[in-house]
């Protein structure tokens, strides 16, 4: 009930305000389970896609959205639960990944749509990163549900990471034809099969989105960017310290020169001796 109310209110407002364009809507089945595998550019991705679909789609969201303290945290948790989001622990705790897979399988077992971001996190720079093989592939192979590739277009320009107020512009959504992986049935624990399935899905997303592809994980890219920013900050601080040291040395030199110039005996001794 709450999902329907949120879709009617928030979804209608999003469509009216941003007017997202959609291609390939006919590729989403009218009924039955299916996995929507999308690139991830913005926090708003999980709202624009459900807004344009006639059916309910359940995404997994990071657990922090459900566990933040205070009134704001409780309201955020209630909102995400109300729109059908499922918490997933991304801290690397043992068993967390399997719990997320079980959640996805439960959604599909009910004959519903399950949404997942194979990159595992938002792209830090608008490029498409390598898909993580564990979640998507195992859910697809265990459930037998078709995987529908989805490309979100320009949502990172509407709400870049860290920006609260969105920019008014028109995003796009391209939905590809369903991918069938029944040929790999019973091979969900084979890591090479997991990699093959994930790469096939990522290639389909790449063709839809037109993004530049980077063959590393987005989490690794974020670490690299954070380390580079940290190094740049350290370099700036070192430069400031060096400038201060140079300034202090120049002041000391100027003071010494000034004091030498004011000394009445400086430079007169040799003249007296010559006389």
Set out the residue ranges of the language-model regions.
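A transmembrane-helix-recognition feature enriched in membrane-embedded lipid enzymes
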Residues: 1-23, 55, 72-83
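Solvent-exposed polar/charged
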Residues: 14-15, 51, 81, 106, ...
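Short gly/ser/thr-rich secondary-structure transition/capping motifs
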Residues: 15-22, 95-98, 156-157
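A generic local structural motif
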Residues: 20-25, 45-46, 73, 101-103, ...
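Residues at the C-termini of beta-strands that transition into short coil/loop
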Residues: 26, 63, 89, 151, ...
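Catalytic core of membrane glycerolipid acyltransferases/transacylases, capturing the structured
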Residues: 28-93
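Non-catalytic C-terminal accessory region of glycerolipid acyltransferases
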Residues: 98-275
């Amino acid at each position: 009930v709450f999902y329907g109310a949120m879709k009617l209110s928030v979804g209608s407002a999003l469509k009216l305000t941003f007017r997202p364009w959609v291609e390939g809507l006919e590729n989403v089945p009218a009924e039955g389970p299916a996995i929507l595998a999308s690139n991830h550019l913005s926090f708003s991705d999980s709202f624009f896609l459900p807004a344009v679909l006639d059916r309910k789609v359940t995404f997994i969201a990071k657990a922090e959205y459900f566990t933040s303290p205070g009134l704001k945290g409780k309201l955020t948790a209630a909102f995400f639960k109300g729109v059908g989001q499922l918490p997933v622990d991304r801290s690397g705790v043992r068993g967390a990944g399997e719990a997320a897979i079980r959640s996805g399988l439960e959604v599909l077992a009910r004959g519903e749509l399950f949404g997942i971001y194979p990159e595992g996190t938002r792209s830090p720079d608008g490029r498409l990163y390598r898909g993580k093989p564990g979640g998507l592939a195992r859910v697809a192979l265990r459930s037998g549900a078709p995987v529908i590739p989805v490309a979100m277009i320009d949502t990172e320009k509407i709400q870049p990471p860290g920006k609260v107020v969105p920019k008014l512009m028109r995003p796009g959504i391209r939905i590809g034809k369903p991918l069938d992986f029944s040929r790999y049935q019973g091979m969900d624990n084979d890591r090479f099969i997991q990699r093959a399935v994930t790469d096939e899905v990522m290639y389909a997303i790449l063709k839809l989105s037109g993004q530049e592809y980077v063959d590393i994980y987005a989490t690794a890219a974020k670490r690299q960017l954070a380390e580079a920013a940290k190094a740049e900050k350290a370099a700036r601080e070192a430069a400031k310290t060096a400038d201060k040291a140079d300034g202090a040395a120049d002041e000391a030199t100027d003071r010494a020169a000034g004091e030498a110039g004011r000394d009445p005996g400086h430079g007169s001794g040799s003249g007296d001796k010559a006389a």
